[in-house]
Amino acid sequence: KCNTATCATQRLANFLVHSNNNLGPVLSPTNVGSNTY
């Protein structure tokens, strides 16, 4: 697992995107980064 602040933020953003698709366009740049792990 990744414990860095950046990775944690990406994981949180990815969780939010899956929780509420309305946030997808807002978090899309971060979501792309989260998909790399």
Swiss-Prot record:
InterPro entries: Calcitonin-like, Calcitonin/adrenomedullin, Calcitonin_CS, Calcitonin_peptide-like, IAPP. Its main location: secreted. Transmembrane segments: none annotated. One of its GO terms (biological process) is amylin receptor signaling pathway. It is found in: Secreted. The keyword Transferase does not apply. Disulfide bonds join C2-C7. Keywords: Amidation, Amyloid, Disulfide bond, Hormone, Secreted. SMART domains: CALCITONIN (SM00113). The modification Tyrosine amide is found at Y37. GO terms for cellular component: extracellular space. One of its GO terms (molecular function) is hormone activity. The mature protein is largely unstructured in the absence of a cognate ligand, but contrary to the human protein, it does not easily form fibrillar aggregates. Can form homodimers. Interacts with IDE and INS. Interaction with INS inhibits homodimerization and fibril formation. Belongs to the calcitonin family. Amylin/IAPP is a glucoregulatory peptide hormone that plays an important role in the regulation of energy homeostasis. Selectively inhibits insulin-stimulated glucose utilization and glycogen deposition in muscle, while not affecting adipocyte glucose metabolism. IAPP function is mediated by the CALCR-RAMPs (AMYRs) receptor complexes. Amylin can also bind CALCR receptor in the absence of RAMPs, although it is more selective for AMYRs. This is Islet amyloid polypeptide. The lineage of its organism: Eukaryota, Metazoa, Chordata, Craniata, Vertebrata.
